[in-house]
């Protein structure tokens, strides 16, 4: 018992003598803003399918080449009166190449139009992604970045217009589903 008390006292004394390092030359600032509610996406554009169609893999001449432009829009309503402009951000999995393009996926079942083997195996196209552009100036809208800002009218409505296109992300594009 005496041994435990002496050991505990020695440990306590060691901790009291231990040096402490404090940094006094740095400052952390937290900044932010509490905003009004957001605009609402209209029901006719909240869940939409943008058909890019069937495109030959030979339509792509190299990395960055584009095919099959398709226009689509996202309409907003009930925007707060304090807002004068709106933008959207698209999210998803980025295509290989890291240029802000959306990766294409694999169909869920072999009955989907991705089964080009006849074996019941679902196949996704490779070497291709989906690139989104602002229709107003044809600038790219990269994943997780704001689109071009669109004016909100006096009724609290706005329509943001875009173009989606397939983009070659690799020199070799293979056939398959490109959803």
PLM regions: where:
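Mature extracellular/passenger domains of Gram-negative fimbrial/pilin and adhesin proteins
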Residues: 2-8, 19-179
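Short, Gly/Pro- and small/polar-rich lid/capping loops
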Residues: 14-17
